[in-house]
Amino acid sequence: MLPPSVTLRPQPLLTDTDLLLYNLIRLAVEDHYLVFARVPLWSVVSVEGDGKVRLQVLRQIALKQLDFVLVHPGTKVAEQVVLLEDGFPPQPHEVSRRQDIQSVLQAAGITLTILKPQTSYTVLQLAQLLGVSEDE
């Protein structure tokens, strides 16, 4: 299957910063959502339509990856997506990626929240940003 000259090794799924944010998000939403990391965009939406158009949309979203997905434990449907925006200002390819993801999520009725990994968040702040705080 693999050419002899190719070597595969496991690699970390999350950076240290991503893992910290993952744990904070998990604590903030633990009574409301399941949290998944590094999820392909195509796996959270159902693309329905005629053959060619459907394939075109699937190709457009095929390699797009979501940083964190919040899934309702009862319906098992993604209700919110968290994207991390590293650079300021964001690079043109990051802006394009975010716009593509944003339009797909909006069409599917999935909420998008953008976080800056270099910002320090508390569990309460994240709960408020993600709409699960007790105050609401």
Task: Specify the residue positions occupied by each region the protein language model found.
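Active-site metal-binding core of divalent-cation-utilizing nuclease and nuclease-like domains
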Residues: L13, A37-V77
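Short, mixed-charge, low-aromatic patches
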Residues: Y22-R26, L55-A62, Q80-D86
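Non-catalytic C-terminal interaction segments of nucleic acid-processing enzymes
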Residues: M1-P10, S120-E136
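Basic, amphipathic alpha-helical patches used to engage nucleic acids or provide basic targeting signals
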Residues: V69, P73-Q128
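Intrinsically disordered, low-complexity Ser/Thr/Pro/Gly-rich regulatory segments
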Residues: D16-L19, N23-Y33, A37, V95-Q106, ...
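Generic signal for short, ordered secondary-structure residues
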Residues: P3-P4, V47-E48, R54, L83-L84, ...
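Generic anion/oxyanion-binding catalytic loop in active/binding sites
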Residues: P10, V57, L115
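N-terminal topogenic membrane-targeting module
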Residues: M1-G49
